[in-house]
Amino acid sequence: MKPTPPPHAPRPDAATLAAWDRDHVWHAFTQMLEYEPLLVERGEGAWLVDVDGNRYLDGSASMWCVVHGHRHGRLDAALAAQAAKVSHTTNLGLSNPTTVEFARRLVEVAPAGLEKVFFSGDGSSAVEAALKIAFQYWLQADPPREGRTRFVAIGEAYHGDTLGAVAVGGVDRFTSVFAPLTFEPIRLPSPGGTCPSTGRPAPSLGESLALLERVLEANTGRVAAMVMEPVLQAAAGIWIHPEGYLAGVRDLTRKHGVLLILDEVAVGFGRTGTMFACQREDVAPDFLCLAKGLTAGYLPMAATLTTAEVWKAFLGPYASRRTFFHGHSYGGNPLGAAVGLASLDVFRDEGVLEGLPEKIERLRAHVSRLADHPHVAEIRHLGMVAGIELAAGKTPRRAYPWQEQRGMKACLAARRHGALLRPLGDVVVLWPPLSISLDEIDRLCAAAEAGIREATAG
């Protein structure tokens, strides 16, 4: 007979939890001297509820992760069913049925030619794996090309916080302190926004592609891969690339024999209106990096998809030393795979992508009305994401002193109106779960507008 478990101790009150939070938790991307706790206790669809019962629209999809809302019945059931079987098995030389099925389903929905799936734990890890695979691929290609060791990256790119991802990242405030630990990529200006360090406007589509071609020609035989966020650079401040840029990059990288790594950690799984952003321009990369929405925001999991051509370069007897000696303890975790499978089922069975155009148009209509606001310098909108850039003046444009944190103030003010938002500098970002209703979009945009009005007054 099993012993009766002891009763749970009563949960500490909200004030005690907040004190423990300040004392013990080091929050990511947060200046802890200024941190004020907000403790989220539960979620309901597009809403989050704190320990005091206050409700907030999840306007950032819990850091761009949540797809179908919180506590979706099918996802909850899939997680519970898998936990009743096994919660974790290693992916190092072992597998499980759920992870195998998930890999197969990912291949089915991914762009053509991406047939192999390497699982890891988060977006940085997905990019890190792609960089290392691309580097090792050229060493083991037939014939080997040992000189292909360079990577091409884009200005203001963000690919994560592990060292390889930091190296190809271009957001200076995130990466500069770690520069001595990393390698130097070949950096191209972004076609999506004004360079913050030089003030130079984004080059045109033609100029951007011509520059890429000159770089690839000047570095013939030296470039392993180009890595980029397709269509939309999220952490740069919601920078949107001109239509045709991605397709042009694919044509040029293929022409010069350079692998193309697309980082869809943020923009994959319906965010731009198609399942993957690269499908907007019918582009199939050599690597596709996925995380965040991979499990619809339920569990940390990532995947790096690549081609059979790349995979074959790693096959051989053990003594040939062709193995990819890289991996993480929780790569291919069956709990994450189970929820990921259920998420793909929801996309298919609930017509998620088919239902997006009306929501996208509602979001566009709301943010467009802010264009005349005296302190809204620019609005950038694509799919189910919008960036509203604040400025001290519009003509000519004058940025607020960065120390004033106007974007953060706008988001904190929006919180008082029932929405949780997170800015990118002075860009107020709207990035709700795809499941958000039209009425909830109205409420989210009203809260954001109120926050902007309060933060820019006076």
Q: What positions do the PLM features span?
A:
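Conserved N-terminal phosphate-binding loop of PLP-dependent enzymes in the Aspartate aminotransferase
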Residues: 2-458
